[in-house]
Amino acid sequence: MNNGSDGPTSAMGLFGGWAALERGYHAMTFDGPGQQAALFLQQLPFRHDWEAVLTPVVDAMVARPDVDPGRIALIGVSQAGYWVPRALAFEHRFAAAVADPGVVDVSTSWLEPLPGFMRAQLQDPSKKDAFDKEMGWTERFSRSTRATLHFRGEPYGVAGGSPFDLYQEVMRYRLGDEVKQVTTPLLITEPEDEQFWPGQSQALHDLLPGPRELVRFTAAEGASRHCEPMGLAVRDTRVFDWLDPHLRAGRVA
């Protein structure tokens, strides 16, 4: 189970861990680079090439006697909706996977609040000083913006430095042609009123060449918004109803 940008591993119990145990699965979660213990104790920042993280995780799992290497599933929540398909392009030992929600471009949630001229500045390295100056004025007049940039920037390894450099780093977190290499069956959630990456679940679904399914969640059933926080029972039921037959069949070699 792969967490997102800022949650503790304990939260993964709510986002599928307990439901997995109830169905007889074993469940494992971890802190990857930029996440909780890996960030605070080891000072390891995020990395966009998440296959470098998940491949060692799978190696550790298959070394255990209580793990069937042909029936390993992966659930990724929040920003892991980007990391999961990125890793699946290179790591093919999962029998099935879930992205909740699908994320094609992490940076859109950072870029959309900016005025157009500042987004244009980010496309031109010669405008770095101008961009940083604009952000400096924003941070001076808004303590909340300054605090948010520091909090959100720290996992990327560039907090407290140049805002231009921070945004450039976040803009690396975009899926490209590598998604054409994804062959693992993937379930993609699409919650109504997604706050951070609206429309990207459908976009990811349309990009993938292999078996995939888009599952929508609505406000009417109490399962709207990012990661369906008020409708976790509904979410878990659909996720594991989809995973069960894939894991019974096992990974196709």
What is the meaning of each model-derived region?
Residues 20-37:
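Conserved alpha/beta-hydrolase
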Residues 182-183, 188-190:
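Short beta-strand/loop motif that positions the catalytic acidic residue
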Residues 205-224:
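Catalytic histidine neighborhood in serine/cysteine hydrolases
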Residues 5-18, 200:
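The serine-hydrolase catalytic nucleophile loop
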Residues 218-220, 225-253:
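Catalytic active-site module of serine/aspartate enzymes centered on a nucleophile-bearing elbow/loop
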Residues 44-70, 86:
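Alpha/beta-hydrolase active-site loop
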Residues 194-200:
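Conserved alpha/beta-hydrolase "acid-adjacent" motif
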Residues 89-167, 190:
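Hydrolase active-site cap/lid region
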